[in-house]
């Protein structure tokens, strides 16, 4: 392919692309890696023949250096997410009115990814049974059976059930707390919304560092059991100053300009203004 620049966003594509360039005698074509694991990315992300490696955090930068990359060819830019997740938060009450959500109590947003996987139902019931003075919004994703069960349940507290939604940026900006698994994309989107996180599950290895990154910086809490989720939520609801401190920490970590910064770097590589 007559490329002037190759960009890899997956660790398994980097070495094959470089081998292909070598076999074609086109090693002058630069390969830029955009690392999409926040902290504990696999070593395959960090190839010394890459012209430039763009990483989301300082911890990922250190990981690259530990993998013997030249620090001058590694740059911290944040994790790129869709532009819809990078807009200013704005007026929460106006957003809630638009979404037809009650405005008088804190909103807990419970998500389990687009497929509605994991212990979402168990966590929803535990939160409801705790009778917290809050509104619970549950996103069941594409899991239609789960959505039907949740809709049929007799909830003790105000609870809103959704399937797969396209308004997730507005949902995040309108909520006060998100309860989610520790995926890098959702974490980055929540940071951009200044949304404190209760993280309840993680993939071994690659997502373990995500939990440490969020909790060590004060933007969230690790709560892998339903009772721990309830404890974290109760503290943030009964002590709004604790929640506000976590929200401020999330805003401090946010990198809403990541995609634009990456685009500018790639354009500069191509000599394009």
What would you call each of these model-derived segments?
Residues 216-217, 224-242:
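C-terminal "capping" alpha-helix adjacent to the active site of nucleotide-linked donor transferases
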Residues 199-227:
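Nucleotide-sugar donor-binding patch of glycosyltransferase catalytic domains
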Residues 51-107, 112-114, 141-142:
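A nucleotide-sugar donor-handling region in carbohydrate enzymes
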Residues 242-256:
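A short, well-ordered alpha-helix in the C-terminal region of glycosyltransferases
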Residues 91-97, 101-175, 208:
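Donor-nucleotide binding loops and adjacent catalytic segments primarily
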